[in-house]
């Protein structure tokens, strides 16, 4: 799905942090430490970033029939 632009609960802007978060976690850093360093301290915001799953590449494989 589309990267969350804002936290679903509190509305804090998060879209600008997702690329940095993903890059650092894939490089092997601990997700909690990355979120702390990015200033994401609320549980709701942390959940929004950590639970996001990118499905768009998987969905583009399927053909829509009309």
Swiss-Prot record:
Gene Ontology CC: cytoplasm; DNA-directed RNA polymerase complex
Q: Which InterPro entries match?
A: RNA_pol_su_RPB10, RNA_pol_suN_Zn-BS, RPABC5/Rpb10
Which GO biological-process labels does this protein carry? DNA-templated transcription
Reactions listed under catalytic activity: RNA(n) + a ribonucleoside 5'-triphosphate = RNA(n+1) + diphosphate
Note accompanying the cofactor annotation: Binds 1 zinc ion.
**Keywords, ordered alphabetically:** Cytoplasm, DNA-directed RNA polymerase, Metal-binding, Nucleotidyltransferase, Transcription, Transferase, Zinc
Q: Where does Zn(2+) bind?
A: 7, 10, 44-45
What is this enzyme's EC?
Answer: 2.7.7.6
Q: Where in the cell is it found?
A: Cytoplasm
> According to its UniProt record, which cofactors does this protein need?
Zn(2+)
The record describes the protein's role as: DNA-dependent RNA polymerase (RNAP) catalyzes the transcription of DNA into RNA using the four ribonucleoside triphosphates as substrates.
HAMAP family attached to this UniProt entry: RNApol_arch_Rpo10 (MF_00250)
Q: What name goes with this protein? A: DNA-directed RNA polymerase subunit Rpo10
Species whose genome carries this gene = Pyrobaculum calidifontis (strain DSM 21063 / JCM 11548 / VA1)
Taxonomy, top ranks, is: Archaea, Thermoproteota, Thermoprotei, Thermoproteales, Thermoproteaceae
Gene name of the record: rpo10
